[in-house]
């Protein structure tokens, strides 16, 4: 997907909203990124239950005013996080909700898992108290499309509304698909992003795979350590990220402030294995995103989940695509952990905040980096610098690979 063309077909980012373990305001999150401050904490109940992995990057909206009962009764945390992030994004974009009450406005919000808690809670109630005590609205709270559906109902969205469910690329796919719909002339504005909730049983399942970090429970802020020699798995996380995407014509017509242009999007499937990342697939998605030409990116926000295999395969992909001229890159997961289907959206927002504020966040590697990263331009400590073009990479189970290319807006 290339972005250059008429104002109607060019796609720009005009609003950002986030719910994360780093905070729920853009300035708080940007400050945490710049300071290298981790949002990962130990979860005491997981220690008590004997989980091997006892750390998480847990988001919270407890300090945020709830929605009306009319809407809250249909929301689990996946939808709730997404709806708050969407509200923040619309406020940031200065876009009146009335503008969404049109078949030209949509919501595409990815989620890798959905709201598992609702299934478990309903089953527990039915088993312990009887079937007649089961809450009536479990299905809309738990269905895989709950995030996009709840946002559509909350804001009266009249256009496209659906949820990409493609593991850890779900949020990136939402951004890419939204951009494609706008570019094709099917939508004028789309709320796009991803959301994921934490649940004990979801953690248990990843723990059973040996996918999660378990060696740093006593030092949780060091547990997610992309590219470290002693990394031992990813740190599960939760939260949401929503971007307001508009056609350039729509944004200019209302005098919107523009963060960036979606300059490219790449998506592909690698068939090397269900849970095995593979450099050729990651590289293919990157190439598709970059196929419109233009300058080499100044910065790459890597997926780098802090897994022994995933980090190295992505390094191989970077070398394959850029050769000896790999751009500066870092992984923000060292501070946030891995929020699964929300990661692509949150990391696009992190990248745009760095672009806005003129810095590149460092990577929480620890003292000893993997030999595979030797000689590569990994940014280990936060540094000031202008980002004109950035690439954000995502990949996940099932071989799904995605990349989003973002150009800083210069008013042209």
Residue ranges and their predicted role:
Residues 15, 33, 86, 107, ...:
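Conserved small-residue
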Residues 82-96, 144-147, 152-155, 161-195, ...:
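Active-site-proximal alpha-helical scaffold in enzymes
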Residues 186-232, 265-279, 304-311, 326-376:
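Acyl-CoA/ACP chain-elongation machinery
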Residues 1-71, 93, 249-261, 349-363, ...:
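ACP-dependent fatty acid/polyketide chain-elongation machinery
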Residues 82-93, 147, 246-248, 278-293, ...:
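Short, well-ordered amphipathic alpha-helical segments that serve as non-catalytic structural scaffolds
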Residues 1-13, 97-102, 294-296, 373-412:
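Flexible, low-complexity linker/loop segments at domain and module junctions
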Residues 2-9, 41-84, 104, 113-177, ...:
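Conserved catalytic cysteine-centered active-site region
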Residues 10-14, 37-42, 219-299, 411-412:
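Condensing-enzyme catalytic core mediating Claisen C-C bond formation in acyl metabolism
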């Amino acid at each position: 997907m290339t972005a250059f063309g008429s104002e109607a077909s060019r796609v720009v980012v005009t609003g950002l909203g986030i719910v994360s373990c780093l905070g729920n305001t853009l300035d708080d999150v940007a400050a945490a990124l710049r300071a290298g401050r981790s949002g990962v904490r130990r979860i005491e109940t997981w220690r008590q239950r004997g989980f091997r992995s006892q750390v998480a990057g847990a988001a919270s909206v407890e300090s945020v005013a709830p929605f009306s009962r009319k809407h809250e009764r249909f929301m689990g945390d996946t939808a709730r996080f997404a709806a708050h992030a969407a509200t923040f994004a619309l406020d940031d974009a200065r876009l009146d909700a009335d503008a969404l009450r049109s078949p030209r406005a949509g919501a595409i919000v990815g989620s890798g898992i959905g709201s598992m808690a609702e299934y478990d809670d309903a089953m527990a109630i039915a088993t312990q108290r009887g079937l007649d005590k089961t809450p009536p609205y479990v299905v809309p709270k738990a269905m895989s499309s709950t995030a996009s559906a709840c946002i559509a109902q909350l804001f009266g969205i009249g256009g496209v509304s659906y949820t990409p469910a493609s593991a850890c690329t779900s949020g990136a796919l939402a951004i890419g698909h939204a951009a494609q719909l706008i570019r094709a002339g099917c939508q004028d504005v789309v709320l796009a992003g991803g959301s994921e909730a934490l649940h004990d049983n979801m953690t248990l399942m990843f723990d059973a795979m040996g996918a999660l970090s378990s060696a740093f429970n006593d030092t949780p802020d060091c547990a997610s350590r992309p590219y470290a020699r002693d990394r031992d798995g990813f740190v599960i996380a939760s939260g949401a990220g929503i971007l307001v995407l508009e056609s350039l014509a729509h944004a200019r017509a209302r005098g919107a402030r523009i963060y960036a242009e979606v300059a490219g999007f790449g998506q592909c499937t690698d068939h090397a294995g269900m849970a095995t990342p593979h450099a050729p697939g990651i590289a293919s998605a990157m190439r598709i995103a970059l196929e419109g030409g233009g300058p080499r990116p100044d910065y790459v926000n890597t997926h780098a989940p802090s897994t022994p295999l995933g980090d190295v395969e992505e390094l191989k992909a970077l070398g394959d695509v850029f050769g000896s001229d790999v751009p500066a890159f870092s992984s923000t997961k060292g501070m946030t952990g891995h929020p699964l289907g929300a990661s692509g959206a949150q990391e696009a927002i992190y990248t745009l905040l760095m672009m806005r504020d003129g810095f590149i966040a460092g990577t929480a590697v620890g003292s000893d980096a993997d030999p595979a990263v030797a000689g590569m331009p990994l940014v280990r400590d936060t540094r000031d610098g202008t980002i004109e073009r950035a690439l954000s990479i995502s990949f996940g189970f099932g071989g799904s690979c995605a990349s989003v290319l973002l150009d800083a807006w210069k008013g042209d």
